[in-house]
A protein has these predicted regions:
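PP2C/PPM-type serine/threonine phosphatase catalytic domain
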Residues: 1-237
Length: 237
């Protein structure tokens, strides 16, 4: 059954002002309804190998016959990428975050590990659809910290889940409704950590064009650009 929605996409990545290597990666297959970012976190400059492994394993993804089958397929591919990273001998144990959005008919399938994020703009209101996997967020969930306190902690950067890092890969997933007029942002932390939520919301609310993501990246660069910056904007009609 074909999707009742049409999507339009713009995407981009930038090395930022301080990194020597862009360890971010992105993948877009609009025909199959898949959008993904990965933020390499490996030591010794090997994070780019991990994020590239994720892209390599999802490149041949084809939409399945149901939400469950689509979720199972992308999960399997990410587990294969996880094993590829684990098998990289002498590569400094490279790892990567991942955040993927699949639009299947009238559903949005979200799957992620780490602190790359998926936002949705609907009716002018921006909502974060994913939850970061880091030590600070764990303490916030346990009630030990306020959200503001968690964001200030250095442990906000210490990931508890990622592709390739731990023995087992633990992914979070969610399924939500898609409506015409929705706009999604899939991005790495180099984008959202530089921009206040209100700024992301206002910039995403502009008329859709290929320049929306470019403008977000330029704004992040002007505010510091301390990390690699990668994002994808998906407009649903």
């Amino acid at each position: 059954m074909p999707s009742p929605h049409t999507t339009y996409t713009c995407q981009g990545t930038h090395i930022g002002h301080t990194r020597r290597v862009n360890e971010d990666a992105l993948f877009v297959n609009e025909a199959e309804g898949l959008w993904l970012v990965a933020d390499g976190i490996g030591g010794h400059g090997n994070g780019d190998k991990a994020s590239a492994a994720v892209v390599e394993h999802v490149e041949s993804y084809c939409q399945r016959n149901s939400v469950d089958d689509s979720l199972a397929d992308i999960t399997s591919r990410l587990r294969q990428a996880h094993q590829t990273c684990r098998n990289m001998a002498g590569a400094g144990m490279p790892g990567t975050t991942v955040a993927a959005l699949i639009i299947f008919q009238s559903k949005a399938i979200l799957i992620w590990a780490g602190d790359s994020r998926i936002y949705r703009l609907r009716g002018g209101e921006l909502t974060l659809l994913t939850e970061d996997h880091n030590l600070a967020q764990e303490r916030y969930r346990r009630g030990e910290l306020s959200r503001e306190g968690a964001q200030r902690l250095k442990s906000a950067n210490v990931l508890t889940r990622a592709v390739g890092v731990h023995q087992d890969l633990h992914l979070d997933a969610d399924v939500t409704e898609v409506e015409a007029g929705d706009r999604f942002l899939v991005c790495t932390d180099g984008l959202y950590k530089e921009l206040p939520l209100e700024k992301i919301q206002s910039m995403l609310g502009a008329s859709f064009s290929e320049h929306i993501l470019t403008a977000l990246i330029e704004e992040a660069l002007q505010r510091g650009g301390k990390d690699n910056i990668t994002g994808i904007v998906i407009d649903v009609r």
